[in-house]
Amino acid sequence: MGTRLLCWAALCLLGADHTGAGVSQTPSNKVTEKGKDVELRCDPISGHTALYWYRQSLGQGPEFLIYFQGTGAADDSGLPKDRFFAVRPEGSVSTLKIQRTEQGDSAAYLRASSL
């Protein structure tokens, strides 16, 4: 049962669903210099109202950053407040901005959406 749960959780984080549609990310990867600003965009699955951002550093599990329900942030308790900003102004596309990147920001930034 543990393996099934792990596979299900991985599919949810990747935004997979039974129709083959998924959460899209722009850009798919980004390399930048220390001190530069980065902007990541998430387009959720059509009709999904909830959107989640996670960060996964090398060798670590996913770390929750922020959760949106519609246009508002329902829980931003994991989002570092000094240089990280996330918005979802129209209840669809969300943008995560990281200002003045640092070495510790190097990670996979994951998005998920749900009904």
From Swiss-Prot:
Cellular localization per UniProt: Cell membrane
Gene3D superfamilies: Immunoglobulins
InterPro entries: Ig-like_dom_sf, Ig-like_fold, Ig_V-set, TCR_beta_variable
Cellular-component GO terms for this entry: plasma membrane; T cell receptor complex
GO annotation, biological process: adaptive immune response; cell surface receptor signaling pathway
Location of the Ig-like domain: 22-115
Broad class of where this protein is predominantly found: membrane
Leader sequence segment: 1-21
Subunit structure as annotated in this protein's UniProt entry: Most probably, the alpha-beta TR is not assembled due to incorrect folding of the beta chain. Alpha-beta TR is a heterodimer composed of an alpha and beta chain; disulfide-linked. The alpha-beta TR is associated with the transmembrane signaling CD3 coreceptor proteins to form the TR-CD3 (TcR or TCR). The assembly of alpha-beta TR heterodimers with CD3 occurs in the endoplasmic reticulum where a single alpha-beta TR heterodimer associates with one CD3D-CD3E heterodimer, one CD3G-CD3E heterodimer and one CD247 homodimer forming a stable octameric structure.
Function per UniProt: Probable non-functional open reading frame (ORF) of V region of the variable domain of T cell receptor (TR) beta chain. Non-functional ORF generally cannot participate in the synthesis of a productive T cell receptor (TR) chain due to altered V-(D)-J or switch recombination and/or splicing site (at mRNA level) and/or conserved amino acid change (protein level). Alpha-beta T cell receptors are antigen specific receptors which are essential to the immune response and are present on the cell surface of T lymphocytes.
The name this protein goes by in its record: Probable non-functional T cell receptor beta variable 7-3
Gene: TRBV7-3
